[in-house]
Amino acid sequence: MRDVYILGVGTTTCGKFPDKPAHILGRKAAWDAIKDAGIHPRKIEIAFCGHVYQGMGVGQRTLKEIGLVGQPVVNVEGACGSGTLSFWEAWRSIAYGQYDIALALGVENLSRILSGGP
């Protein structure tokens, strides 16, 4: 098993964003992490995107916005632990030698979720 290092991080501010889709918020966080790492986006070999309520393909929509196309993007869902699960998957893929550079992100915008209750 190989050592794994975090090269960069990015986030959005916490708050209510009813007019911004989750993939737009995720794009900012992903781009900030890539800039913080000091790497070119095409160096990323695989990405894992954790989410719960954003529907199919949110990882692909998020990363297409910053030019990441052609690399595998795996959407993972684990309720409140979805972002952590995406990080674990990225760590595992590097630790076991499948990839050298992976991106892990969690994408959600609960301001846009309609209430399903009474």
How does the language model describe each region?
Residues 1-73, 92-95, 107-118:
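Conserved "HGTGT" condensation-loop signature of ketosynthase/thiolase-family condensing enzymes
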Residues 77-108:
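Active-site-proximal alpha-helical scaffold in enzymes
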